[in-house]
Amino acid sequence: MGRTRENKATVIADLKELLSEAQLGMVIDYQGLSVAEITELRNRLRPSGAICKVTKNTLMEQAITGDEAWEPMTNFLKGSSAFVLVKDDVGSAVRAYQSFKKDTKKTEFRGGVMQGQALNEDQVKAIADLPSKEELIGQVAGAINSIATKLAVGVNEVPTSIGRGINDIPNSLGRVMAAMAAKEEGNG
């Protein structure tokens, strides 16, 4: 028995909601994967804020119709399609999928969509090579901390230099006085 019209409308609405929250969508061919393997893929994707949704191409097509951000996905809707929708850590999710693909050798990457642009596998791999959000935050924090440390050392150096200069005045004055006395003795 097929889905009812109301059931299809609910599925389409759910897909639209998932797409509205996603940064990246990948279409993969899941033919040949067992239920256990699809569950394994979902478990690998979950920590990165991604989900794997298996649905009919026609329902996904209805969900993306009219949405410029996702319309390029229509080029990849053929055969047995699973949709990896990434909300949070794009790089981590792509790496999780690549690891799964390498381990199972059963999925085929059809294409990806990000910000209205169709992406091939090499472009998606390039995204995976970018540092994660946490790594970028760490790099920025390290740079800010480095600047603050250098500024503190520089600010601290000014009074230290003034102090050294003030401490040298009596010594310099003593040397000047000794030189003047030696000069007077030499003249006298």
UniProtKB/Swiss-Prot annotation:
It holds the Pfam family Ribosomal_L10. GO terms for cellular component: large ribosomal subunit. Gene3D superfamilies: 3.30.70.1730, 6.10.250.290. GO terms for molecular function: large ribosomal subunit rRNA binding; structural constituent of ribosome. GO terms for biological process: translation. The keyword Zinc-finger does not apply. It comes from the Bacteria. InterPro entries: Ribosomal_uL10 (IPR001790), Ribosomal_uL10-like_sf (IPR043141), Ribosomal_uL10_bac (IPR022973), Ribosomal_uL10_bac_type (IPR047865), Ribosomal_uL10_CS_bac (IPR002363). The keyword Ribosomal protein applies. Keywords: Ribonucleoprotein, Ribosomal protein, RNA-binding, rRNA-binding. Forms part of the ribosomal stalk, playing a central role in the interaction of the ribosome with GTP-bound translation factors. Belongs to the universal ribosomal protein uL10 family. NCBIfam families: PRK00099.1-1 (NF000955). Part of the ribosomal stalk of the 50S ribosomal subunit. The N-terminus interacts with L11 and the large rRNA to form the base of the stalk. The C-terminus forms an elongated spine to which L12 dimers bind in a sequential fashion forming a multimeric L10(L12)X complex. PANTHER family: 39S RIBOSOMAL PROTEIN L10, MITOCHONDRIAL. This is Large ribosomal subunit protein uL10. The lineage of its organism: Bacteria, Bacillati, Cyanobacteriota, Cyanophyceae, Oscillatoriophycideae.
